[in-house]
Regions:
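Walker A/P-loop phosphate-binding motif and the immediately C-terminal alpha-helix
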Residues: 5-42
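Conserved helicase/translocase P-loop NTPase motor core
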Residues: 105-118
Length: 205
């Protein structure tokens, strides 16, 4: 499987990365590729556009309900994935209840389970798209980079300073894990105001 079709889309919350990620997954599927779409955000809304606009049960919810957070038991891929439009397999990490636990750890647990189930093995999918919250690039949110599940990193930015601040931190994490073969493929500018001059983003790039 070509790692060129395995993309991690990072960005500040509300920047539009889920829309861009789901469009990427749809584009790959329309090309006849077998696609896995992985939402790595506690809001678990990455797959909304792929499953008729309904929030799917998250990995963390299913995992805790069926097997508990430490025991994979007889967990099957079908237990944690939902078939979306165009045959895209969808999974959402979800997160803990507010004030309890770490959302980044939830992402790591999900990826560990997918790996144990063989979902992330080479040859399983033609394309894998990870939609990852980038406000805080802790070890959990950086798991797709750290564990080498994808090489190509795309950062969604806007003209807002906090979006560029988050992008700068994400770029630093890409550099940290560059020994795994990950690289920054580029920025996607999703402007809040289409009339705004793009000079700030161009200078940042």
């Amino acid at each position: 499987m070509s790692m060129q079709n395995n993309i991690v889309v990072f960005g500040k919350g509300g920047i539009g990365k889920s829309t861009i990620s789901s469009n990427l997954s749809s584009l790959y599927a329309l090309q006849g590729l077998k696609v896995l779409h992985v939402g790595c955000d506690p809001k678990h809304d990455s797959t909304l556009g792929l499953v008729d606009g309904e929030l799917i049960e998250t990995f963390m919810e299913k995992y805790a309900r069926i097997f508990g957070v430490r025991d994979h038991g007889e967990l099957k891929p079908s237990d944690i994935m939902v078939k979306g439009r165009l045959g895209i397999d969808c999974v959402e990490a979800g997160g803990p209840e507010p004030g309890v636990g770490c959302a980044g750890r939830g992402i790591s647990l999900m990826l560990e389970a997918l790996q144990d189930l063989g979902v992330l093995k080479e040859g399983g999918y033609d394309a894998r798209v990870f939609d990852v919250l980038g406000d805080v690039v802790c070890g959990g949110f950086a798991a797709p980079l750290r564990k080498g599940f994808a090489e190509k990193i795309v950062i969604v930015v806007s003209e807002e300073l906090m979006a560029l601040y988050a992008a700068n931190n994400i770029a630093k994490s890409v550099k940290t894990y560059s020994s795994n073969g990950v690289y920054l493929a580029g920025l996607v500018a999703n402007l809040k105001d289409g009339k705004v001059e793009r000079g700030r983003i161009e200078r940042f790039a």
